[in-house]
Amino acid sequence: MDGKALTASSLFDITGRVAVITGGGTGLGLMMAKALEANGAKVYILGRRLEPLQEAAKQSTHGNIHPVQCSVTSHADLQGVVDHIAAKDGYINLLVNNAGISTPNLGPHATRPTPKWDISKVRDYWFHKSFADYAAVFETNTTASLMVTFAFLELLDKGNKKSEEEAKASQARNGAGKARIEYVRSQVVTLSSVGGFGRDNSAFIYGASKAAATHMMKNLATYLAPWKIRVNVIAPGYFNTDMMGNFYKATGGRLPASLAPEERFGDAQEIGGTIVYLASKAGAYCNGMVLLVDGGYVSNKPSSY
């Protein structure tokens, strides 16, 4: 292999890739969309609210971020998006399951308990939470990732076939003979969370939904192997998102070393660089992986992974 193939411009080249990101109008979804698009990909961003998606698209580098209104918990919406992208491009190379919600209605007893707490109040606080609210967290954070993946399965498969044909044509032009055809295979990346690893917080349903999503994606990596579709997980720590915005403002983006050895929130370059790595030749050998992007948060919690 010559040196040119090992340069950053070759290793991380994603020119012409087609990506879909759920929850792509804000937060981590937007950070990843901008990074992919800035490096040559065409990116469809999905979300329930059209206005934030349209504003997000204005932040593109090359005018190649495309907003599509869609609820990830609606079969009809998902089918509509699949049909739209099939008509426009006919395939995708990357699906990022990023849409997520937090545990609703957290309050004074959503921290680590102490013996001073009135156990009757603790009981009432948790017992009277809504079953529907908690079910909605699993519906969005876990079930929807599976549904969205299967919705786009045929387009991911067509992405593989297109990449394989392009690789064959390239080999023929270069006189490579009948060497094995290699290409970057289609991929699903699901955003989990460090909250799915720890066991010392009280966001019970959120943490459980993210732990379930992580495990489910490992299952899916095995299930989709016959079609050569890869599945990986990114488990982010603290980033300045809608979900963590108030905490970011309160801390000025700084964290104690006991919480994260890097002592700060992650930024757009770090989550953006992660998704570009996974989408490119540099990350093409990754499958069934859980990648922690957390500034060391989980490493501070022994036996958590």
Curated annotation (Swiss-Prot):
Q: Catalytic residues per the record?
A: 192, 206, 210
Question: Pathway involvement?
Answer: Secondary metabolite biosynthesis
- Respond yes or no to whether keyword Oxidoreductase is given for this record: yes
GO BP field: (M)-viriditoxin biosynthetic process
- Tell me the keywords, alphabetical order: NADP, Oxidoreductase
State where NADP(+) binds.
Answer: 28, 98, 206, 210, 241
Q: Example GO molecular function term?
A: polyketide synthase activity
Q: Which domain of life is it from?
A: Eukaryota
Any Pfam family from its record, for instance, is: adh_short
Q: List, alphabetically, the PANTHER family matched.
A: 7-ALPHA-HYDROXYSTEROID DEHYDROGENASE, SHORT CHAIN DEHYDROGENASE_REDUCTASE FAMILY (AFU_ORTHOLOGUE AFUA_5G12480)
Role this protein plays: Short-chain dehydrogenase/reductase; part of the gene cluster that mediates the biosynthesis of viriditoxin, one of the 'classical' secondary metabolites produced by fungi and that has antibacterial activity. The first step is performed by the polyketide synthase VdtA which condenses one acetyl-CoA and 6 malonyl-CoA units to form the heptaketide monomer backbone of viriditoxin. The product of VdtA is then O-methylated on C7 by the O-methyltransferase VdtC. The O-methyl group is important for the stereoselective coupling of the monomers at the final step of viriditoxin biosynthesis.
What does the similarity note say?
Belongs to the short-chain dehydrogenases/reductases (SDR) family.
Output this protein's name: Short-chain dehydrogenase/reductase VdtF
Gene name of the record: VdtF
